[in-house]
């Protein structure tokens, strides 16, 4: 039955509903901590997106891209805005749309593996679980509204599902590329699969893709026009307020390594540094990954399970294709997901010039759905038997490697909720009547959003919202500076928080011409920053 076209496999409606319900419950369970406990994984990057949504519903600004950028389309802010109107402004309501996206991607994968690959819903659940319950590090990123982490996976699924509806396909590609340029990998993979399977070798197939690209270009033109009217650096600003320029195409072009000697180093790091964190096999404290927890992810020797799971699947698919020498429709979606992952890995290596680190994990998350595609492909070409059973046991073991830390994390928050130092900072400032302050980037916007702008903290090292600097300067008589360590004349408010005297920050230089005077890069996040 493996490899048959899905039309020959009439699965029961009950099986579909049960499989879907199980997957949805698993995605919901692994997401609870990161959505409903604000201290779990929250920083200034996420806060800026929340402030964009707040300014939008208040009519104070028209944000188009992430404040301070002319790329990274602010889709997450527009998704959060109606939730803010209904349920109020909070970290949970900011992340709630991303929870829905995670649920939607899981359902799209499950349904497509049944419909296009021909897997039974219960069997298709196993590959989907690689996305449904990834490592806590990946789950945290999938639910972080800081520029589009889960978005490329969503657009990958949507581009495939709308491939025969070129206008919709072009719309999703156009928006997806502007939100996160990694969406390009999905379009390149689709073109490759359509060349291999045949559609792109026909006149109709070429017409569809030309229509797709025409629509995408139309989306880009509309956004380019709207950009002139957008609030690029917060309320009351335009794109002229930025000291640097760029767009998704420029960002993509800048991510190519010019040192070929670094590529072998990158390939090595992909397997010894990136994959162990991405797939949760390396033992690591979650607080090293920016998660407020005393728990850990990974187990000693778990990499063996991952290597066997992926290695057997690759070998099984390769041997089958070598023997059969015929392409079946059931292979196309699996190949598409695998190609997306391979392109993502190549882009990550080239873009980081071989230097891969878990702090840049968000730049390569598509390998998660790549493993889903590889697993489904193996199941599609391997008939029931001992090999299939052994492999499914290994795959289930790999799911347990990531599920156990997720369960431990949830239990930790339910039984003994960790302290919330971010909220404590807000409480200390409010208790002292502090409404205006300077601070570093990684605290400024985080505190301002948590305080619902009752406290305005202007960033003195990397400015995304210009209005805050002007407000603090206008209230310099009552403003202070918040620091992480001792400062002359300062007083400690709590561990890691000093209230310091106001120091005049130099006036912002007038905007430079595009591309002439770049704004300083975002400062590195301090270890264990709160």
Question: Where does each model-flagged region fall?
Answer:
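Transmembrane-helix motifs of polytopic, lipid-linked glycan transferases
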Residues: 20, 24, 96-118, 138, ...
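Perimembrane helix-loop-helix junctions
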Residues: 5-6, 186-220
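Membrane-lumen/periplasm interface segments of specific transmembrane helices
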Residues: 207-305
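Aromatic- and kink-enriched transmembrane "portal" helix at the membrane-lumen/periplasm boundary
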Residues: 33-36, 77, 91, 95, ...
């Amino acid at each position: 039955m493996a490899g048959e076209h899905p039309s020959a496999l009439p699965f029961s409606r009950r099986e579909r509903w049960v499989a879907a319900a199980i997957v949805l419950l698993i995605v919901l369970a692994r997401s609870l901590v990161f959505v409903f406990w604000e201290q779990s994984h929250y920083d200034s990057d996420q806060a800026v997106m929340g402030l964009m949504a707040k300014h939008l519903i208040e009519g104070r600004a028209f944000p188009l891209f992430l404040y301070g950028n002319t790329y990274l389309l602010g889709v997450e802010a527009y998704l959060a805005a109606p939730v803010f109107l209904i349920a109020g402004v909070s970290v949970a309501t900011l992340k709630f749309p991303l929870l829905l996206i995670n649920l939607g991607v899981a359902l799209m994968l499950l349904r497509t593996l049944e419909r296009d690959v021909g897997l039974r819903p219960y069997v298709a659940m196993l590959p989907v679980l690689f996305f449904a319950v990834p490592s806590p590090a990946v789950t945290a990123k999938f639910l972080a509204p800081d520029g589009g982490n889960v978005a490329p996976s969503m657009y990958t699924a949507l581009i495939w599902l709308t491939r025969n509806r070129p206008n919709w396909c072009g719309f999703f590609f156009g928006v997806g590329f502007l939100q996160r340029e990694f969406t390009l990998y999905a379009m390149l993979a689709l073109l490759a699969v359509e060349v291999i399977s045949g559609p792109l070798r026909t006149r109709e197939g070429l017409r569809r893709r030309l229509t797709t690209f025409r629509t995408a270009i139309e989306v880009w033109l509309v956004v380019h026009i709207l950009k002139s009217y957008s609030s690029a650096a917060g309320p009351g600003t335009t794109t002229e307020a930025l000291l640097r320029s760029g767009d998704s195409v420029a960002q993509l072009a800048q991510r190519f390594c010019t040192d070929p000697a670094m590529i072998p180093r990158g390939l090595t790091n992909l397997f010894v540094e990136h994959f162990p964190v991405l797939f949760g096999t390396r033992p690591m404290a979650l607080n090293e990954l920016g998660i407020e927890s005393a728990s850990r992810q990974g187990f000693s020797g778990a990499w063996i399970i991952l290597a066997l799971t992926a290695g057997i699947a690759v070998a099984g698919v390769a041997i089958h294709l070598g023997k059969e020498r015929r392409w079946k429709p059931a292979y196309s979606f699996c190949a598409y997901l695998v190609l997306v992952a391979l392109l993502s890995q190549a882009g990550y290596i080239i873009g980081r010039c071989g230097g891969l680190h878990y702090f840049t994990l968000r730049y390569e998350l598509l390998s998660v759905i790549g493993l889903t595609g590889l697993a489904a492909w193996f199941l599609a070409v391997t008939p029931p038997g001992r090999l299939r059973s052994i492999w499914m046991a290994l795959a289930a073991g790999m799911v347990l490697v990531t599920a156990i830390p997720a369960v431990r994390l949830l239990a930790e928050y339910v039984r003994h909720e960790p302290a919330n130092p971010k909220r404590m900072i807000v409480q200390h400032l409010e208790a002292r009547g502090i409404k205006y302050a300077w601070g570093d980037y990684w605290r400024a916007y985080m505190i301002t959003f948590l305080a619902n702008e009752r406290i305005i903290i202007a960033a003195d090292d990397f400015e995304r919202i210009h209005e805050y600097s002007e407000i603090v300067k206008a209230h310099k008589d009552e403003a202070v500076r918040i620091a992480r360590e001792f400062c002359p004349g300062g007083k400690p408010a709590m561990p890691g928080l000093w209230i310091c005297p106001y120091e005049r920050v130099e006036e912002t230089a007038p905007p430079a011409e595009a591309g002439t005077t770049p704004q300083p890069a975002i400062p590195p996040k301090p270890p264990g920053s709160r």
